[in-house]
Amino acid sequence: MGSRALRFLAVCAVGAIGVGVAFAVTAPILKSSKVARLGSIVVNGKGLTVYHASSEKNGKVVCKGNCLYFWFPVLAGKGKVVLGKGLSRAKLGTTKRPNGALQVTYNGFPLYRYYRDSKPGQFRGQGVKDPAGKWYVVSTSGKVVTTPAPTTGTGGTTGTSTGSTTTVIGY
């Protein structure tokens, strides 16, 4: 192989490494969203609602194992968490998960997404009961929102079709 080809491959390799590093340093984004019935709540960068389990206090992680099939932790990744307008950096933190990953907390609450929320404005995890506790949306002030979810299906973009006494079966 000629020196010209080797230089080309070296440049490509360095470029690929640079792109990989750019993707690796992305940080989660948290922002504020106004949702009917709930007020101003914390959402992720895609506008999806984030939740807190009632049994998880002071950064203590209880949702692990099969719980993670339903609730997806908001992980810190690399770099500083990006906060949108209306959120307080003083309330932002992290806690260590059992696997060593850092999970984002807001006002001490470890944050999760619910597997049934697929569009901004949905809050189908609100009031769900399971072995990890009862799940609540987190307000931008750092408090849990206890407003119950609708008890009948809305077919739209908000609420839950099973109400606030849903139990997630299987773990």
Language-model segment annotations:
Residues 4-7, 20-171:
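Compact beta-sheet-dominated domain cores in extracellular/mature segments
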